[in-house]
Amino acid sequence: MKVIIVKDNVEGGKEGYKLFADAKKNGATTFGLATGSTPITTYQEIIKSDLDFTDSISINLDEYVGLPEDSDQSYDYFMHENLFNAKPFKHSYLPNGRAADLEAEAKHYDQIIEDNPIDLQILGIGRNGHIGFNEPGTPADSTTHKVSLTQSTIDANARFFEHEEDVPRYAISMGLASIMKSKHILIEAYGEDKADAIKGMIEGPVTTDLPASVLQNHDNVTVIIDEAAASKLSNK
């Protein structure tokens, strides 16, 4: 893993943007995207730039199950607000969390990934080491699947909802094996509350107890973290 330690998430966003710009320059056509607060500064830098994605495809990591189509908490809404409205893609794929048959939707999504290999995948990491909605215990060979969210993830996402009971209990997420197919993986993390997860991901054993640790088995991972998230690393 290549580790880049930055002052804060603003500087991290600039570093993340550089990877998107380099990927585009080198012919990348398919980008794996993530939601949440972590990638926002990278998306802001992309929006300010002259990068054009109208010839590119985006594939998002995950989506909540069961939210109304017009919900402003859906990841589809998030992506339009934070990137797509300003930088449209030729085609943008997100899992359909309202599908009547979620198992069939998961297989369909895996086929999309198979047909459009991801050149650059951006990730955040949860405090418990989850990537996408792949919670601790998720097998390394997992493909797109329905996920029961852990209480810690529900608690972390509750700030985006009016009431804690409004937070969905299920999501549909690319699996760890799906993510590992990406040619280049960028993972960003900011803040001291991510320090334990980052240490485990980089320096700990590869274990299903910390899903992000599987990234040690990928040969092209860039980690962008601030000093607080890097604070528990032995080698900096």
From Swiss-Prot:
PROSITE patterns: GLC_GALNAC_ISOMERASE. Its EC number is 3.5.99.6. GO terms for cellular component: cytoplasm. It catalyses: alpha-D-glucosamine 6-phosphate + H2O = beta-D-fructose 6-phosphate + NH4(+). Keywords: Carbohydrate metabolism, Hydrolase. One of its GO terms (biological process) is N-acetylglucosamine catabolic process. Pathway: Amino-sugar metabolism; N-acetylneuraminate degradation; D-fructose 6-phosphate from N-acetylneuraminate: step 5/5. The active site is at D62, N128, H130, E135. InterPro entries: Glc/Gal-6P_isomerase, Glucosamine6P_isomerase, Glucosamine6P_isomerase_CS, NagB/RpiA_transferase-like. The keyword Hydrolase applies. GO terms for molecular function: glucosamine-6-phosphate deaminase activity; identical protein binding. The keyword Ubl conjugation does not apply. Catalyzes the reversible isomerization-deamination of glucosamine 6-phosphate (GlcN6P) to form fructose 6-phosphate (Fru6P) and ammonium ion. Belongs to the glucosamine/galactosamine-6-phosphate isomerase family. NagB subfamily. This is Glucosamine-6-phosphate deaminase. The gene is nagB.
